[in-house]
C-alpha cells in the first residue's frame, strides 16, 4: 500500500482526493470493504486536512454550490462523490441541542468536528440486538479538530450540547446504509431507520417551505462561521452566503446588518398564510397538509406588518406598515426568510437608515 502524507500547512480538497486515490480502497460497485489500514491512513489525512482553513474553504465552496442547486434532503447530502471510488463527502449541521438520535452505520465512515463541539454516544450493537433495546457503551467528547472513524457496523448518536451551531465533516463508504445481513427480525426499538423517508416528498406546496427552510438555515450556519475562517476565500464565501439568502449574516462589528432594502416573495404562489391575535401576540400561520401551523409571532408593534404579510405574496421591506424602524423591518424580513415562507428577490437598494 502506498500512503501519501499531506503537508498539514497546505491541504486542499483536491490534494486529499489525490491521497485517497493512492490508497487501497475498492472501486465503486465492488462488494469488498477496504482493509483497516486504508481507513486509518485516510483518517490521518483527514486529521491534517480539517486543521487547514483553506481546505475547509474549498469544501464549503462545493457545499454552497450544492445548496444553490437546492438538492437537499434529510440526512447527509454529499457535496462531492469521488469518481471511480464512490467515496462521499458531506457536512453535518448541528443546531444547539441537535441530534439525529441513535442510528446505525453499516460500513466505514470518518467524521471530523470542524467547528465548535459534539458529544458522541456509542451503543453496544451486539448486546442491543440481543436484548432488543439500546445498550449504551461509551460517551465521547469531540471538540473542533477531533477525528473519529467507524470500521465495522456501529450504532451511535452524536449530539450538540452547546449553545452554538456545530459543523462536522463526513467521509463515508458508498456501502454505508446497506443491510449487513447479520441481524434479522423487526427493527431495533429506538433506532432510526437506515433509509429514512423524506417527509417533504409530497405534492403539497408546503414542501417548498420545508426545503427552503432547510436550505437557508444551512447557508446561515456557514455564514456565521466564516468570520473564524482564516482563509483568503472567506470573503467570497460570505458574499455567496449573502446572495443565497443569508443576508443577516453580513454584519459589521456593531452587529447591525450592512444591507438595507430588498424585496421578498412567497416561496410558492399557492402557499396560503393567515394571521390571528393570540394572547396579545400577532401570529402568522401557514396551511400545511395537516392543518394550520404557527410560523412566526410578534408583539403588538408588529401587528400591522404580520397582517400585511399574510395577504401579500411579494413586497419590499418598506412596504410593511406600522411604526417600525429599518432595523425592525430587517429583522421581520429576516425571520420570514428563515421560516422558509419567503425568498429574497431582485437586487438590494438603498433605503433610509435610522
For the regions a protein language model found, what residue spans apply to each?
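A short glycine-rich, His/Asp/Glu-containing loop-to-beta-strand
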Residues: 65-96, 144, 284
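Short acidic-glycine-tyrosine-enriched beta hairpin
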Residues: 84, 110, 125-156
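Conserved short histidine dyad/triad with adjacent acidic residue
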Residues: 90-104, 141-142, 151-153
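Glycine- and acidic-residue-biased ligand/ion/polar-headgroup-sensing regions
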Residues: 95-96, 106-125
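Short beta-strand His + acidic residue motifs that chelate non-heme Fe in jelly-roll/DSBH
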Residues: 100-103, 120-121, 155-162
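A short hydrophobic beta-strand segment most commonly corresponding to one strand
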Residues: 110-114, 163-180
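Acidic, low-complexity/disordered tracts enriched in E/D and polar residues
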Residues: 230-309, 334, 349-354
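Short acidic, hydrophobic short linear motifs in intrinsically disordered regions
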Residues: 304-324
Amino acid at each position: 500500500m502506498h500512503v501519501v502524507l499531506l503537508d498539514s500547512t497546505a491541504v486542499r480538497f483536491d490534494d486529499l482526493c489525490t491521497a485517497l486515490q493512492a490508497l487501497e480502497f475498492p472501486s465503486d460497485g465492488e462488494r469488498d470493504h477496504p482493509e483497516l489500514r486504508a481507513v486509518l491512513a485516510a483518517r490521518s489525512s483527514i486529521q491534517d486536512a480539517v486543521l487547514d482553513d483553506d481546505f475547509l474553504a474549498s469544501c464549503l465552496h462545493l457545499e454552497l454550490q450544492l445548496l444553490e442547486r437546492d438538492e437537499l434532503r434529510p440526512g447527509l447530502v454529499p457535496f462531492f462523490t469521488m469518481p471511480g471510488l464512490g467515496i462521499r463527502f458531506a457536512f453535518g449541521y448541528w443546531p444547539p441541542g441537535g441530534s439525529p438520535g441513535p442510528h446505525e452505520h453499516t460500513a466505514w465512515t470518518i467524521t471530523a468536528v470542524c467547528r465548535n463541539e459534539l458529544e458522541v454516544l456509542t451503543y453496544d450493537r451486539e448486546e442491543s440486538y440481543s436484548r432488543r433495546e439500546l445498550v449504551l457503551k461509551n460517551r465521547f467528547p469531540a471538540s473542533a479538530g477531533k477525528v473519529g472513524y467507524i470500521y465495522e457496523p456501529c450504532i451511535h448518536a452524536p449530539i450538540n450540547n452547546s449553545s452554538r451551531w456545530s459543523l462536522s465533516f463526513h467521509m463515508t463508504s458508498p456501502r454505508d446504509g446497506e443491510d449487513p445481513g447479520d441481524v434479522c427480525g423487526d427493527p431495533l426499538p429506538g433506532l432510526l431507520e437506515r433509509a429514512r423517508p423524506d417527509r417533504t416528498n409530497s405534492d403539497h406546496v408546503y414542501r417548498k417551505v420545508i426545503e427552503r427552510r432547510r436550505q437557508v438555515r444551512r447557508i446561515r450556519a456557514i455564514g456565521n462561521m466564516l468570520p473564524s475562517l482564516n482563509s483568503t476565500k472567506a470573503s467570497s464565501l460570505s458574499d455567496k452566503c449573502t446572495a443565497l439568502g443569508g443576508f443577516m449574516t453580513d454584519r459589521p462589528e456593531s452587529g447591525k446588518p450592512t444591507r438595507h432594502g430588498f424585496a421578498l416573495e412567497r416561496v410558492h404562489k399557492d402557499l396560503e398564510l393567515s394571521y390571528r391575535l393570540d394572547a396579545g401576540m400577532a401570529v402568522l400561520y401557514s396551511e400545511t397538509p395537516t392543518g394550520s401551523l404557527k410560523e412566526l409571532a410578534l408583539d403588538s408593534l408588529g401587528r400591522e406588518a404580520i397582517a400585511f404579510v399574510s395577504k401579500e405574496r411579494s413586497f419590499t421591506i418598506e412596504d410593511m406598515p406600522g411604526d417600525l424602524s429599518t432595523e425592525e423591518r430587517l429583522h421581520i424580513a429576516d425571520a420570514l426568510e428563515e421560516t422558509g415562507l419567503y425568498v429574497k428577490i431582485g437586487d438590494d437598494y438603498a433605503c433610509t437608515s435610522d
